[in-house]
Amino acid sequence: MARIAGVNIPNHKHTVIGLTAIYGIGRSRARKICEATGIPTDKKVKDLTDPDQDALRKEIEKFLVEGDLRRETTMNIKRLMDLGCYRGVRHRKGLPLRGQRTRTNARTRKGPRKAGVALKK
C-alpha cells in the first residue's frame, strides 16, 4: 500500500480512485493531479514506482488535505457559532442552515424522532 498524505491508498484500485481515499481529494482533483504528474489514470496503485509516488506526494502537498482541511472546516464552523449569526445559531441547534423546511423532514440533521408527550383525557 502506498502511503500518501498520511493515508494508506488501496493497492488494487486505479490511481484516480485510490487518491479519493484522501480527505479533500475527489475524482476531479485526483484526475488533475494525475495529469500534472504524468501518471496514467488507469494505472493501478500497486504498479506505481517510487518516483511516481514521490511526484504524487509533491503535487498533493500543494493542496489543503486531511487534518489541515478538517481543522479549517471546524474552525470556520466554530467562528460562525461564536459570531452568533444565523448560520452559527443553526449549527448550534443542529438544524438545517440553508432555508430548508423543518416542520416535516430534516430528519438527517435533527436526528431520530423524540417520543411525544401524550395528554390524559
Curated annotation (Swiss-Prot):
**Do the record's keywords include ATP-binding?**
no
Q: Which UniProt keywords apply?
A: Ribonucleoprotein, Ribosomal protein, RNA-binding, rRNA-binding, tRNA-binding
List the molecular function annotations (GO) for this entry.
rRNA binding; structural constituent of ribosome; tRNA binding
Q: Where is the signal peptide?
A: none
Q: Name one Pfam family in it.
A: Ribosomal_S13
* Keyword Heme annotated: no
Q: Where is this region: Disordered?
A: 94-121
Name one process (GO BP) from the record.
translation
GO cellular component terms listed in the entry, alphabetical order: cytosol; small ribosomal subunit
HAMAP family assigned:
Ribosomal_uS13
Q: How is the subunit organization of this protein annotated in UniProt?
A: Part of the 30S ribosomal subunit. Forms a loose heterodimer with protein S19. Forms two bridges to the 50S subunit in the 70S ribosome.
Q: Which NCBIfam families match?
A: uS13_bact
Q: What does this protein do?
A: Located at the top of the head of the 30S subunit, it contacts several helices of the 16S rRNA. In the 70S ribosome it contacts the 23S rRNA (bridge B1a) and protein L5 of the 50S subunit (bridge B1b), connecting the 2 subunits; these bridges are implicated in subunit movement. Contacts the tRNAs in the A and P-sites.
Which family would the database say this protein is a member of? Belongs to the universal ribosomal protein uS13 family.
Q: Which PANTHER family match?
A: 30S RIBOSOMAL PROTEIN S13/40S RIBOSOMAL PROTEIN S18, SMALL RIBOSOMAL SUBUNIT PROTEIN US13M
What name does this protein carry? Small ribosomal subunit protein uS13
**Origin organism of this chain?**
Ralstonia nicotianae (strain ATCC BAA-1114 / GMI1000) (Ralstonia solanacearum)
Q: What is the lineage of its organism?
A: Bacteria, Pseudomonadati, Pseudomonadota, Betaproteobacteria, Burkholderiales
Gene behind the chain: rpsM
